[in-house]
Amino acid sequence: MKPTIALIGRPNVGKSTLFNRLTRTKDALVHDLPGLTRDRHYGHGKVGSKPYFVIDTGGFEPVVDSGILHEMAKQTLQAVDEADAVVFLVDGRTGLTPQDKIIADRLRQSPRPVYLAVNKGEGGDRAVLAAEFYELALGEPHVISGAHGDGVYYLIEEILENFPEPEAEEADAKHPVFAVIGRPNVGKSTLVNAILGEKRVIAFDMAGTTRDSIHIDFEREGKPFTIIDTAGVRRRGKVDEAVEKFSVIKAMQAVEAANVAVLVLDAQQDIADQDATIAGFALEAGRALVVAVNKWDGISEERREQVKRDISRKLYFLDFAKFHFISALKERGIDGLFESIQAAYNAAMIKMPTPKITRVLQTAVERQQPPRAGLVRPKMRYAHQGGMNPPVIVVHGNSLHAISDSYTRYLTQTFRKAFNLQGTPLRIQYNVSENPYENAEDKPKKKPLRRVSLSNRIEKREGRKEEKNRFKKKTKVSVKKQFSK
């Protein structure tokens, strides 16, 4: 799996700027006000062939005992515990501060590898900037500039040297590999135990975190399967925002290794933003998806109707997925859930013949033509499959850039129905044929061809022959003179 790198440091040393550099995004807010990043943001990046996750923490104020800064410090310590490597960021302009020393004392107690990065080092003497930070006893300081990128590549390259090359993606396995994902304490491990029929995973009635996801191989009706459980062996502890946030990283890691994701929701709790975030990542990754609404037996009929309304409102983008209302503890609804997992896997790995895809496309266009965009009406000619997991359909034609989102949804539903693609995202790509008359004014004009009569061609050919004969005679004369001397 991808290693997770946590960015640690006191407020306003440039963690969010470095985060943006490492992920090539602007997901974390960047401002000169200390403490602006009050929770952890997470993203992923890649150096060469090695991918990684990165967490941008809030500023670490270790001397504060209460209030929001104290909560930020708790989240930071949680990130250190869960990360595979820590980048401790200090400010090269401000220099070494007492807060830096306190944070360094905490980090030296951590079993995680810590890399000291002296930020805002652009334009300065590296040796001078790094000198005073040797006092922190965290190894060789790396002088970098998060804003300009100086030294960042070499820092991350050194961190990733200690992690093995990524293995081949299990998502391409020849059997279903499904990840059980969701927020803490929604019943993921209980569901895994119910599917396996034995208590292979320790589960407590208390939310916690895990160092590693657990891969469990098993057979069902003679067929091989692999479950990736993101709950794992839990630590007893208070459920706080840090635990909630870090569950996203675990879900992201598991989803990338799976070809089906099982999203577990808690019927006794409201649908949270965290649920939508995890579901959205599975959708973005193109994974087949099944949703298990757990603890269904413990709520009233009125509450059940409310949960269904919340799901349709907050998780509307999962209209392709099959929803199951289950009780993992009492093992109710598990058989139907497993049937949907198998069906979603089959749909994600489907191979669709090109003639049938094209026929479905033509029928859809005959039934409802794409609307005009100004004077242009898109013309669709044929389609073929462009990939699996998720299935991709490539449509060829003219002026396809004018296709509206609503018409793409219409085509998606048409293809989904024709090929029974329940439980998997379906992506449609448009391959636009180049129009030779488009932007004709901007293209260099070719010289017009002149018509040449047959008599003119003969005259030119005879002229070339005469010229060639004269050249041969001159050459013979010059050669004779040369050897006669």
Swiss-Prot record:
Disulfide bonds: none annotated. GO terms for biological process: ribosome biogenesis. Residues 457-469 have a biased composition (Basic and acidic residues). Gene3D superfamilies: 3.30.300.20, P-loop containing nucleotide triphosphate hydrolases (3.40.50.300). Residues 435-485 are annotated as: Disordered. It comes from the Bacteria. Residues 350-434 form the KH-like domain. PROSITE patterns: G_ENGA. SMART domains: AAA (SM00382). Residues 470-485 have a biased composition (Basic residues). GO terms for molecular function: ATP hydrolysis activity; GTP binding; ribosome binding. GTP 1 binds at residues 9-16, 56-60, 119-122. InterPro entries: AAA+_ATPase, G_ENGA, GTP-bd, GTPase_Der, KH_dom-like, KH_dom-like_a/b, P-loop_NTPase, Small_GTP-bd. GTP 2 binds at residues 182-189, 229-233, 294-297. Belongs to the TRAFAC class TrmE-Era-EngA-EngB-Septin-like GTPase superfamily. EngA (Der) GTPase family. GTPase that plays an essential role in the late steps of ribosome biogenesis. Associates with the 50S ribosomal subunit. This is GTPase Der. The gene is der.
